[in-house]
Swiss-Prot record:
GO terms for molecular function: ATP binding; ATP-dependent DNA damage sensor activity; double-stranded DNA binding; mismatched DNA binding. This is DNA mismatch repair protein msh3. Component of the post-replicative DNA mismatch repair system (MMR). Heterodimerizes with msh2 to form MutS beta, which binds to DNA mismatches thereby initiating DNA repair. Msh3 provides substrate-binding and substrate specificity to the complex. When bound, the MutS beta heterodimer bends the DNA helix and shields approximately 20 base pairs. Acts mainly to repair insertion-deletion loops (IDLs) from 2 to 13 nucleotides in size, but can also repair base-base and single insertion-deletion mismatches that occur during replication. SUPFAM superfamilies: DNA repair protein MutS, domain I (SSF55271), DNA repair protein MutS, domain III (SSF48334), P-loop containing nucleoside triphosphate hydrolases (SSF52540). It comes from Aspergillus fumigatus (strain ATCC MYA-4609 / CBS 101355 / FGSC A1100 / Af293). GO terms for biological process: mismatch repair; mitotic recombination.
């Protein structure tokens, strides 16, 4: 509070506190007239009291302007501290400030003020010296001259009278030069403030000098222009420039405007600093996952030194050193065990995302670069989350069906393209990956790598050197298995080697190149031990996704998925997409399913379910994170405890025969589980479980397992803390107290509290540093305490580094057992998949299939597996009887919406389920080993390739004719409908004849061309049979109604009843009536033609009975049936 003149006697010096003066103390009112000044000076003390009531008139030496602080002590304002900013403090403005502070405290004469709100403007004109000369008081005159002189210099300093623009200019030019970010307050100044240069504060271009932090960011950004950088600055992570704009858009955070470009573009020369956005440190991975999921490449730039170690080092005055420590994309994000998936999509019925594979592709022999060339393709697909590697090398035709099949099977989230692709392949890749609505469920990131003419030789050398160095580092260069391993890699096809070399280089950038050391998990895609399901088959039969909204619900995988673990679900997905061809392996698998569902094994099966139910984490991903060295301490504890729990569950099992199951698959899988128990217990004995659960790095290891570095720094910390305790007696002696007790306030330790009495404060030495205080006490640090705390902080930082180093060594030791741990997890995944299939088999109406070496499909009362689960009503079952030696093909006719497509899909799905090793929805099933299922269903064009619907239809058919074998199942739906009736019938008849006579595949041919039914007569032994979907008719004319029975019957449906579908589609009634009349007229015309043809044949037979052979009579019967 401001004291009145009657209370203006100065207090004792001991109770006075100096308080900083604000900038407002330099403001003055407008200069008064000479007469008024003279009168005011004569008034003396009254004017002093009036001036004291106006805070903006307070001066540095005004004795009357006293205030009370929170302690109740009387304080006096201290003179303002002013930076020199390049001005000589002895000769310039700094000296005047010093002199002004030493002016005697005397009453000030009042100055005139405006009658409006701008009471405290600077005077626009200089002081009137004449008015000062008229005063009779020499002391007042001297004081006023000093004040006016100070006022002139201050106004000049501000840049002009009545102007505050200079203050703003100084703030914008000085702040960036001294600190990295004054606004954020995240970090102390990394370099001392730079004095302002004389003259203009900014360059001619505009904008200020770059801060050390901005220089670091620009230097890193120039090396990674395609990466969004997240930079650690103190206690936040920050984005700069264009990265800040993208982050603000994707993360919904605030972007502070500024420069967007990193190239000093003239259009941004007027801006002083970069645009920026920030996120808290503990939310880093949450936001990184969101950016990576959006398709961006994200880099994390971290500080490589801590504040304590930096303060003790030689570079204490330099900016913090920073480095790009992590790079992330969709496929390489392994820092979170949940990955980018979150909840299991298949289980929730949500969208089916990409599988996490990164696929590298390259081409050769792409001559012509048109749409019809043949190319040789090599691919390598890597799944960093699990360590799986798939490779393949193949030729492909102009439709690129082989490439499409592999892309749909693997479903990559990232593509690495080596060299240029042909136009057809490029268009296919863009079609499959260029939209969020594609078959992968999300947009796919695409990176491109240049391909030299000598790429094959260079790639071979690079791969050889890579594996040779790894084997040498592992000291296994002379081992026979290691040599065989190296030879296996070097024997890969040329184009696969090119892709492998590119992927090694690509993943090295992300620190994940170690995955290629796990060559045990290299798999060839085109292994002939599995049924081939090409791209069209995956889509048409809805193996992984439905065709409505591309989600997993309603797919075959969704139907069979009853797994309890993530790694079990991934293995089941592989089983679904790659059914077995090996009859022995298949029988072993289905026998295991049968044993799990049998009542005699209920107890053992429940024991397995309980064991799998205890697994709450994704062990497969956990293990690969341990292998990469990215596992956290609580995660490691969870993994080891989970492995210990499941290993102890079957600790009594020594051999497969001890498992309680007769199935070899079940016995071997269970016997492999307890084999890891010894290693797991050994690693757990090194860990302090309580500390690991709380992520306490300092106490993570048990005392007996701590390294020398950890023990040394812990002793150092204990020694410093002991010295701090000993220092209490020294502090007590200085204060003349019996004893001193340390206190902690706001997280600051080792504070000494002293009462705010005059006697107590006198005893506090000047070297003690006041840290905080209240009205009653003040808290101090002694110089010795400050020095000891600095030593303790250095020991703590070094201890943290030693703990991290020891933890990394433990992870490397565990990683040396990766193979055995991975085999155990793979056994658990197998058990999970078999239990899932057993749950399916336990449903009513499912039967164990019988396998035969003969190519056949004999199913009694079969049902569609997905439709049956989705529909509330019961599904109408149907039989199927196909045999390579008897009826190889069925010609399926029937009304629209009569169930033709569902029937043929049902047959294909039952065959696939049987070769997965699952029970099938039927009364009985006997199936041969099919090597492939091909489908040509649906109608769509390919505008990107300039292909019409009919062109796409025939191209896909041509691919089927090239790949199909006598052991394949082929489904052709309404071939030939994309052109005129005559051409369509001709093409359909030719294709059907070729399939039955030449390829001899099992064929299901759906058509609305009744004329094709005559072909059945031309094949002996009923190789081609006519079947139709049954229905009943009622009414006639416009009241005609049709009822679908969804049952398969022998013979041909001579009408398609398209008008019935038109009625269901709610076409206008007048339109339907016109269509019905036209249809009746056309049918009558065709019937008359057939009747005329029949009469002509009968007449010819009467004239020449010799024509009456078997084929002639069959034709007569067929024509009569069509009437």
């Amino acid at each position: 509070m401001t004291l009145s003149s009657s209370q203006s006697s100065p207090p004792s010096t001991q109770n006075l506190k100096r308080k900083q003066q604000t900038i407002s103390s330099f403001f003055t009112k407008r200069a008064p007239s000479a007469e008024k000044r003279s009168n005011d000076i004569e008034d003396g003390r009254a004017t002093t009291q009036k001036g004291a009531e106006m805070p903006l008139r307070e001066t540095a030496g005004d004795q009357n302007n006293l205030e009370d602080d929170e302690d109740g002590d009387v304080v006096v304002r201290a003179p303002k501290r002013v930076k020199t900013n390049g001005v000589d403090p002895e000769n310039g403005f700094g000296r005047n400030i010093k002199e002004a502070s030493n002016i005697a405290r005397r009453p000030d004469p009042p100055l005139s003020s405006s009658q409006r709100t701008n009471l405290y403007k600077f005077a626009s004109s200089q002081a009137d010296d004449a008015g000062i000369e008229k005063t009779d008081d020499p002391e007042a005159r001297q004081r006023q001259l000093e004040r006016e002189k100070l006022h002139k210099l201050f106004v000049k300093k501000l840049g002009g009278a009545d102007c505050l623009i200079g203050i703003g200019r100084d703030a914008t030019t000085e702040a960036p030069s001294g600190t990295e970010d004054v606004a954020e307050g995240d970090e102390d100044d990394e370099s001392p403030p730079q004095p302002r240069s004389k003259g203009k504060g900014l360059s001619k271009k505009g904008g200020s000098k770059l801060t050390p932090l901005e220089k670091q960011v620009i230097e890193i950004k120039r090396k990674h222009m395609d990466t969004i950088l997240v930079v650690e600055v103190g206690y936040k992570f920050r984005f700069f420039g264009e990265d800040a704009r993208i982050a603000a858009k994707e993360l919904s955070i605030v972007c502070i405007p500024g420069k967007m470009r990193f190239d000093e573009h003239p259009s941004e020369a007027h801006l002083d600093r970069f645009a920026s956005a920030s996120i808290p440190v503990h939310r880093l991975h949450v936001h990184v996952k969101r950016l990576v999921s959006a398709g961006y490449k994200v880099g994390v730039v971290r500080q490589l030194e801590t504040a304590a170690l930096k303060a003790a080092g030689d570079n204490r005055n330099a900016p913090f050193s920073r480095k790009l420590t992590n790079l992330y994309t969709k496929g390489t994000y392994v820092d979170d065990v949940e990955g980018l998936d979150g909840a299991t999509p298949a289980a929730s019925g949500g969208a089916s995302p990409a599988t996490g594979y990164m696929l590298c592709i390259t081409e050769t022999n792409a001559k012509g670069w048109g749409n019809d060339e043949k190319v040789h393709v090599g691919i390598v697909a890597v799944q960093p989350n699990t360590g799986d590697v798939i490779y393949d090398d193949f030729d492909d035709g102009f439709m690129r069906s082989e490439v499409e099949t592999r892309l749909l099977h693997i479903a990559p989230c990232e593509l690495v393209i080596v060299g240029e692709l042909s136009k057809a392949t490029e268009k296919l890749v863009q079609h499959l990956s260029g939209s969020k609505l594609n078959t992968f469920g999300d947009k796919v990131r695409v990176d491109r790598v240049a391909k030299k003419k000598t790429a094959v030789a260079e790639s071979h050398s690079h791969v050889a050197n890579f594996y040779a160095a790894k084997l040498k580092a592992a000291n296994t260069a002379d081992d026979a298995p290691a040599s065989n391993l190296l030879q296996k890699v070097l024997n890969l096809p040329e184009q696969v080697t090119v892709c492998l070399s590119a992927m090694i280089q690509h993943l090295t950038e992300y620190g994940l190149e170690h995955i290629f050391e796990l060559t045990k998990y290299f798999q060839h895609f085109s292994s002939r031990s599995h049924m081939l399901l090409n791209a069209n088959t995956l889509v048409s039969l809805e193996i992984y996704q439905n065709q409505t909204d591309h989600s997993a619900k309603g797919s075959l995988f969704w139907t069979l998925d009853r797994t309890q673990t993530r790694f079990g679900q991934r293995l089941l997905r592989k089983w679904v997409g790659r059914p077995l061809l090996d009859k022995e392996r298949l029988e072993e698998r289905v026998n295991a399913v049968e044993e799990l569902k049998s009542p005699e094994r209920t107890v053992q099966a429940e024991r397995l379910k309980i064991m799998l139910g205890k697994i709450k984490s994704d062990l497969e991903k956990n293990l690969i994170r341990i292998y990469y060295g990215k596992c956290t301490r609580p995660e490691l504890l969870t993994v080891l405890q989970t492995l210990q729990t499941i290993a102890q569950e079957y600790v009594d099992v020594k051999t497969p025969q001890d498992s309680g199951f007769t199935s070899p698959i079940l016995g071997e899988a269970i016997a492999r589980v307890p084999s890891i128990l010894g290693d797991v217990v050994k690693f757990l004995n090194k860990i302090n479980m309580h500390a690991a659960r709380n992520d306490d790095k300092y106490e993570f290891f048990r005392e007996s397992e701590e390294t020398e570095g950890i023990s040394e720094h812990k002793c150092g910390i204990a020694s410093v803390e002991h010295e701090l305790e000993e220092h209490r007696s020294v502090a007590a002696g200085i204060l003349k107290w019996p004893k001193v007790t340390y206190v902690t306030s706001s997280g600051i330790e080792y504070l000494i509290e002293v009462e705010n009495s005059a006697a107590a404060i006198k005893r506090v030495p000047a070297s003690w540093v006041k840290v905080s205080g209240t009205k009653k006490v003040s808290r101090f640090h002694t110089p010795e305490v400050i020095q000891l705390l600095r030593q303790r902080d250095q020991h703590k930082e070094a201890l943290a580094a030693a703990c991290d180093q020891a933890f990394a060594a433990l992870l490397a030791e565990i990683a040396s057992n990766y193979q055995s741990f991975r085999d155990c997890v793979q056994s658990l995944a197998t058990l999970d998949c078999l239990l899932s299939l057993a749950a399916i088999a336990s449903q009513p109406g499912y039967v164990k299939p019988e396998y035969t070496d003969q190519t056949c499909i004999h199913v009694e009362q079969g049902r569609h597996p997905m439709v049956e689960q989705l529909l509330l009503d019961s599904y109408v079952p149907n039989d199927i009887d196909l045999d390579s030696d008897k009826t190889r093909a069925l010609l399926v006719t029937g009304p629209n919406m009569g169930g033709k497509s569902s029937y043929v899909r049902q047959i294909a799905l039952i065959a696939i389920m049987a070769q997965i090793g699952s029970y099938v929805p039927a009364r009985s099933a006997k199936l041969g080993m099919l090597d492939a299922v091909f489908t040509r269903m649906g109608a769509f064009d390919n505008m990107l390739a300039g292909e019409s619907t009919f062109m796409v239809e025939l191209s896909e058919t041509a691919d089927i004719l090239k790949q199909a074998t006598p052991r394949s199942l082929v489904i052709l739906d309404e071939l030939g409908r994309g052109t005129s009736t005559h051409d369509g019938v001709a093409i359909a008849q030719a294709v059907l004849d070729y399939m039955v006579r030449t390829i001899r595949s099992l064929t299901l041919f759906i058509t609305h061309y009744q004329h094709l039914s005559n072909m059945a007569q031309s094949f002996p032994d009923h190789e081609l049979r006519n079947v139709h979907m049954r229905f009943t008719e009622s009414g006639s004319g416009k009241d005609e109604e049709i009822t679908f029975l969804y049952e398969v019957g022998e013979g041909v449906a001579h009408r398609s009843y398209g008008l019935n579908v038109a009625r269901l589609a709610n076409l206008p009634a007048p339109l339907l009536e016109v269509a019905r009349q036209k249809s009746s007229e056309l049918e009558e015309r065709i019937r008359r033609r057939r009747l005329a043809r029949l009469l002509a044949d009968v007449g010819g037979l009467i004239e020449d009975p010799a024509k009456g052979d078997e084929n002639f009579f069959q034709r007569l019967i067929s024509n009569a049936e069509q009437l």
